[in-house]
A protein has these predicted regions:
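Short beta-strand scaffold segments in enzyme catalytic cores
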Residues: 1-2, 118
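Short glycine/threonine-rich loop-to-helix capping motif typified by GTGT followed
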Residues: 3-12, 202-212
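Glycine-rich, mobile lid/loop segments that gate access to catalytic sites or pores
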Residues: 23-211
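Intrinsic structural disorder
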Residues: 1, 16-20, 188-189, 212
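Active-site-surrounding "flap" and adjacent substrate/cofactor-binding loops of secreted or lumenal enzymes
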Residues: 8-22
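Short N-terminal amphipathic alpha-helices
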Residues: 1, 12-15, 29-34
Length: 212
């Protein structure tokens, strides 16, 4: 669903843009139960009120106004170059590299688009990062190992085998690439052999994305 308001004389192909974005994210297969060519795209975008628009569009750009107001709050930190918390920055980096691996299609070929990550960092009493304690990576994947039969035990065995492969790939393929992409010595020093990895903690993540 595309919703909002705008005043413009330009033509925008909302259907095409929405489908291209969905395709770029990676939802391109019917087996995902949501894909770019067949999903419904509903537009609820309407023209902005002229009363609001008169306060937005001015002849003098220096007098350009705002049609509405809002209150936001937040903070910046000097932990990273983009002024975001280090734990969030690392989690984003993990997901970016994971998406790169999926798009390349050379290793971890079972990857599907949906994923999330969390990084827990230990700090000293002065607020300085000391070490990475825990990394969580949950990634959607194909059902790439089928059970030997219809029994619950066979299904559990297949799920455990898949989880073992995914965990091994996260630790030995994904994370080395993440670390190689970091060029800040202080950040690199936070990685250690005692990091606790939680990979797909629920055990299986085949159903995901909008369908999930």
């Amino acid at each position: 669903v595309l919703a909002g308001e705008v005043k413009t004389k330009a033509y925008v192909d909302l259907q095409l843009i929405a489908r291209e974005v969905i395709k770029k994210i990676g939802y391109t297969k019917g087996e995902y139960m949501f894909e770019s060519n067949s999903c419904g795209v509903l537009s609820a975008i309407h023209e902005q009120s002229p009363d609001i628009n008169r306060g937005v569009e001015r002849q003098d750009p220096m007098e350009q106004g705002a049609g509405d107001q809002g209150m936001m709050f937040g903070y910046a930190t000097n932990e990273t170059e983009n002024y975001m918390p280090l734990s969030l920055d690392l989690a984003h980096r993990i997901l970016q590299v994971l998406a790169d691996i999926r798009r390349e299609g050379e290793v971890m070929t079972y990857l599907r688009p949906d994923s999330k990550s969390q990084v827990t960092i230990e700090y000293d009493d002065n607020g300085n990062p000391v070490r990475i304690d825990t990394i969580v990576v949950s990634t959607q994947h194909d059902d790439f190992i089928q059970p030997a039969d219809d029994s619950e035990a066979a299904q559990l065995k297949a799920d455990e085998e898949m989880l073992g492969i995914i965990r091994n790939d996260v630790v030995n393929i994904l994370m080395p690439r993440v670390i190689a992409s970091i060029h800040h010595e202080k950040v690199l020093s936070l990685f250690n052999d005692n990091i606790k990895y939680h990979v797909n903690p629920t055990g299986k993540f085949v159903i995901g994305g909008p369908h999930g």
